[in-house]
Amino acid sequence: MAEEESEFLEAYAGIRTAYKAAMTQVDLAVSHEEQESPGQAIVAYELALRMIEDTFGIPVGLPNKIDTVQAEWNDACALIQKLKSAETELRYRLKVLRSQKQSIDDSAVEATEESRAEMDTKRPPLLAENPSTQYGIANASGAPKTYRELAAGLRELLAVRDAKVLLDELFRAQVKMYRIEASGSVTTISGSSTMSLVMCTVGGKWKYLSGIYFIQCSMPNEGTAGIWLYPLVPSITNCYQTEYGAFIFPDMECQQPGNAFGLMLTKEGQTSRTEDELEDLQQFFLDLLEAVLAGTVVQLKSPTSQRAGLASDTVSGSEQVSRHIVSAADFIASNLVRGAEKTGGFMLRSTPYIISKMTPASMDAQVPSSVQTSVEVAQKVTHAAAGMTGWIAGKVGTASMAVGRYLAPHIQEQGSKLLQKGFGYDTSEANSTMEGAMTIAAGAVEGVSTVFDGLETSAKILGSSLSENSVKIIEHKYGQQTGNLASGTFDTVGNVFVVSQNVNYITPKGIAKKMVKRTGEAVVSDYKRDLRKSESHYINAGSLYPDLRALKE
């Protein structure tokens, strides 16, 4: 058996052992809670969570031929998904226990005894994936609805033809739907169906459902009554997005933990839609989910992009630094950027200092007329025609690539001269140093592009800070003509942002990300390698997930 397969089997054995130990600890925590020992239960739950997190961190060697270890691979995926499901429930139980413990500390003993008796009758089944929600608290009974009660109430409401309910459809697309079993098996539920994200407004006996968001999919194979519903509840519903376009939702109504549903947006029925438009549509859906679920959408990386090991003896120091930048950006992207306004403020404060340290060009750099024309056309069209939004979205990338490719040789040439003059480097040493710096810059661009995935308010902030500050720097260094070109490019981004408010497949985040990424890629294109690819093929156990790409078509 090949070495890679042996490494995987060794990791698989470690996952099984860690899984058994973690679930034993979970059982202990549950027993403490059932015995009404909240302090001991909290400690036990916290230890169980740490054990689960340690299991997710186990390095797994990727086998070259997965068919030879298919059964073990499927079992490993199933174990990891069971742990992920358990992790969600453990965090919920910890939240409940800590809240109860705090209320006990802050209230009289007599009152706490009464509330404890009530909680015993209302407590949801432990680890049964049916948590209580905030919906229904204002009702006469005062009892919050569980997730399953919400789902059942929605189905009952939609089945009443004369119900006075307002359903606002926020999003619609064609999707393929999959069922993911706890065992790791994946089956197709619907080859193609219409999916909508809907907000419900209703009164009367259904008042507890007012304000709830839910996803519904038509099920052509199930007859007229075939509608799949999935309530979206902040802090309760978890959503995962894979990097190949699937959105995965845990099955909250199934008694067996670890089951899930997968949705993948498709172009079926809309053959005129391009891959870029489909990608923008996915991004828009992701933005909506993040807004509805208060940011609890987890990005899942596929094994091929999670290769962690780096062969340090076969790459240059600059490339190692570049790879580390990319790796770090992948890790922090989903959690890093919450204060984009601070970035804009920093740029505003730092621009005068940067300009003061730069020597302006002796003469304006000449920009090719074709580039100027493309930017001018983009400006005019974005100001005049909202119907051309899709065309402009593509032209943003074209204009930014032109700016980046024009600036690249100037950056390296001027940097090399600076090293020779200021630090006494000879020509060869200076050029080599700048080449290393550009290689690092390639990683920085890739990292910045990755981190931009996490921005929530990118276009407004970037459209302002970039146009106000980057243009000043470019104009100071390379002259008025280049500054005008950059200004026009960023103005195009601003105009497209305004137009995009009425187009559901273009988002502020997508436009800004595309602009920044393509400009940077052009600057460092000659130095950029496949920074995620390495000689080692390891991923963390927490990245294992059934691969829906096999069912994509």
Swiss-Prot record:
Compositionally biased tracts (Basic and acidic residues): 113-123
Free-text disruption phenotype from the record: Mutant larvae show an overgrowth of the third-instar NMJ, with an overall bouton number and satellite bouton number increase of 40% and 90%, respectively, compared with wild type. Mutant larvae also show a decrease in the amplitude of evoked excitatory junction currents (EJCs), but normal spontaneous miniature EJCs (mEJCs) and axonal transport. Adult mutants display reduced locomotor activity and progressive vacuolization in the brain, which is associated with neurodegeneration.
Example of a GO cellular component annotation carried by this entry: terminal bouton
Domain of life of the native organism: Eukaryota
Tissue spec: Expressed in larval brain, ventral nerve cord and neuropil (at protein level).
Keywords: Cell membrane, Cell projection, Developmental protein, Endosome, Lipid droplet, Membrane, Neurodegeneration, Neurogenesis, Synapse
InterPro entries on file: MIT_dom, Senescence/spartin_C, Spartin-like
GO MF, one example: small GTPase binding
Disordered: region residues: 105-130
First-listed, main subcellular location of the protein, grouped into a coarse class: membrane
GO terms classed as biological process: cell division; negative regulation of BMP signaling pathway; negative regulation of synaptic assembly at neuromuscular junction; nervous system development; positive regulation of receptor internalization
SMART domains per UniProt: MIT
Record-annotated Senescence domain positions: 325-509
Annotated compartments: Presynaptic cell membrane; Early endosome; Lipid droplet
Occurrences of domain MIT (ranges): 15-96
One Pfam entry name: Senescence
PANTHER family noted in UniProt: SPARTIN
Assembly and binders: Interacts with Eps-15 (via C-terminal region); the interaction is required for spartin localization to the NMJ presynaptic membrane.
Identification of the protein by name: Protein spartin
Recorded name of the encoding gene: spartin
